[in-house]
């Protein structure tokens, strides 16, 4: 569900009101039953919430929506759109439950609704976002964030950091890792035999040979060349205003 005070419940309700999701899978909402009921009522959707307990098989008909609430105590009253420890903590519990169900084979995949990073930190969960939390919960040796839109798939070298800190955080090893994970995802998850990976520059005009910064020559180009040597079809650093058109 994401943060109950956020847009997650609304997005989920509207998605489940259509037929596309049901054609793809048997959806299970992990979140607050009362929040889903209030959201559906406010949106005037023809959906009925069916509370689910434990790991029992779910049988749904028509416009039924299965909701599993892992919270031991009901959520206190909260204000929509306002960060709070209670809702932040709840969103973390929802994620933990989803990961557990996936690990024991009860569900095949997880789709996350937005969390509020301020709220989860207020609740004592000091993660900058979903990616880092999921990696920790699954004891992943490596992880990365890839966003997908149409034919474009973007893998990040850094996540959830201030722009002023980017230069000092970029290393050749981190860039090589991102390129390698992108290649693994494209070949393994998407079945693309020989994916082309455009490596983005950091500075305007790819640094213009050091005129606008040296990160390209110092770490990005060496990482790209090392990846090329391993057989990955990675480009040399490309300016941001060019890379999308060139590699779609």
Q: What do the PLM-derived regions correspond to, one by one?
A:
Residues 1-130, 173-247:
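Contiguous, glycine/small-aliphatic-enriched amphipathic segments in soluble metabolic enzymes
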Residues 61, 142, 150-153, 193:
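A generic structural signal for well-ordered coil/turn residues at beta-strand boundaries
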Residues 66-67, 143-145, 154:
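Conserved beta-strand scaffold positions in the cores of enzyme catalytic domains, especially
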Residues 135-149:
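FAD-binding core/adjacent interface of flavoenzyme oxidoreductases
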Residues 147-177:
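Ligand-binding beta-strand-loop-alpha-helix segment within the catalytic cores
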